[in-house]
Amino acid sequence: MDPRSEVLLRQAELFEGELLLAGLPADDLLGLLPQAHGWSWHAGDQAQLAARFAGRSRFDTQMPEGDYRAAVLFLPKSRELTDYLLQALASRLTGRPLYLVGEKRGGIERAAKQLAVYGKPRKLDSARHCQLWSVQIEQAPATPDLDALAQVYSLQLADGPLQVVSLPGVFAHGRLDRGSALLLEHLDSLPQGHLLDFGCGAGVIGAALKRRYPSSRVSLLDVDAFALASSRLTLARNGLEAELIAGTGIESAPGELAAIVSNPPFHQGVHTHYQASENLLTQAARHLRDGGELRLVANSFLKYPPLIERHLGPCRTLAEAEGFRIYSARR
């Protein structure tokens, strides 16, 4: 059981009846709160919740419809995303309580101050290195317009400017990270065919691929609903079309790919997880056609080449700059 869920269950009498759990973990909480519903933007968590509690959790960037007597937000990492989610929840809770739960090292005390916009925050509990806060919504705010919160920036690429649209909560929100910047400089000479941007974020790599290889089918895969929404906006902004896939990892990718191109993710909340990246390296061969290529950017300190060579083939370093390397291997 997630420690945040355990903190909620210490006050179980507060969470009876129709309740919305936003950003909930994939644990037993829905089973222990039989009238609660979930709102998830993590495809992996949603898949587990859907398998165990069919019809009780929704994967989306928008608050699910329903008449909830209360809502709980499990604190996300991004302050901007927290602002959006709190406003979305508060907009439907006039005269009702909104709860915020999170880990101390995740910044719950700082985030609790964001509740003050809606009323006087109260700390209800502190246990398992987590805190539970609440606020009674005195006057509901307007429903937030997610698209209006997007940040747009322009990249000057060799084949012309590319507009990137970034929503709150997406990796490197409102800017181009150094790893992706290096990868954008090394997208030439990829095999023709079906191309995948794995861990697409705001869609910068996928959009660049589609423009560079217009006759190729391009797919963008991410675990996060806000990333996929950002990618959709980025593609539309540049007049491009590509397939978007909500997936838990490389196992969700299509087969017979000509190339997998990636700035693979390794952050989840306040924790660092390399599992999705390592799965990409160990399983890429299953999704590539003969002669298909894996091309990725990674921090130089990560020992990826031995893993790539063990599971795919000889690994070449195409470039190195500012603590990052571009690796390439073919099946």
From Swiss-Prot:
InterPro entries: DNA_methylase_N6_adenine_CS, Mtase_sm_N, rRNA_ssu_MeTfrase_C, RsmC/RlmG, SAM-dependent_MTases_sf, Small_mtfrase_dom
EC nos: 2.1.1.172
Broad class of where this protein is predominantly found: cytoplasm
Residues annotated as signal peptide: none
Enzymatic reactions: guanosine(1207) in 16S rRNA + S-adenosyl-L-methionine = N(2)-methylguanosine(1207) in 16S rRNA + S-adenosyl-L-homocysteine + H(+)
Annotated compartments: Cytoplasm
Tree of life domain: Bacteria
General function of this protein: Specifically methylates the guanine in position 1207 of 16S rRNA in the 30S particle.
Family label: Belongs to the methyltransferase superfamily. RsmC family.
Name the UniProt record assigns to this protein: Ribosomal RNA small subunit methyltransferase C
Protein species of origin: Ectopseudomonas mendocina (strain ymp) (Pseudomonas mendocina)
Gene assigned in the entry: rsmC
